[in-house]
A protein has these predicted regions:
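A basic, amphipathic helix-loop patch mediating RNA/tRNA/ribosome contacts
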Residues: 8-54
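Glutamate identity and glutamate-enriched acidic tracts
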Residues: 3, 36-37, 57, 73
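C-terminal structural segments of small proteins and small subunits
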Residues: 47-74
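N-terminal beta-hairpin/loop module of FHA
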Residues: 1-8
Length: 74
C-alpha cells in the first residue's frame, strides 16, 4: 500500500498519479486513465480532475493508494 500525504483539502486524480510515480507527466495521464482501470473507493473512474479527499482509496493494477493527511497519522 502506498500513502499520498496531502496538506490541502483535496488532490486531483491526475496529481495523485504523478505523485505516486505511476505516470511521469500530465500529458501521459489522459492516456493512462483511458487505457487502465482505475478504481476510486471501489468505483471505476475516467475523470482525471476527480477530487480525492483524505481517506479515499485508489486501486490501480492491484496497487492500493490511500490519500492521507497529517491528522490521519498516529
Amino acid at each position: 500500500m502506498t500513502e499520498i500525504l496531502i496538506t490541502t483539502p483535496f488532490i486531483t486524480l491526475q496529481q495523485a498519479l504523478k505523485l505516486s510515480n505511476i505516470v511521469q507527466s500530465g500529458g501521459m495521464v489522459k492516456l493512462y486513465i483511458k487505457n487502465e482501470e482505475i478504481l476510486v473507493n471501489g468505483l471505476r473512474t475516467t475523470q482525471r480532475g476527480k477530487k480525492l479527499y483524505p481517506g479515499d482509496e485508489l486501486i490501480i493494477k492491484d496497487q492500493k493508494i490511500v490519500i492521507t493527511t497529517k491528522a490521519n497519522e498516529n
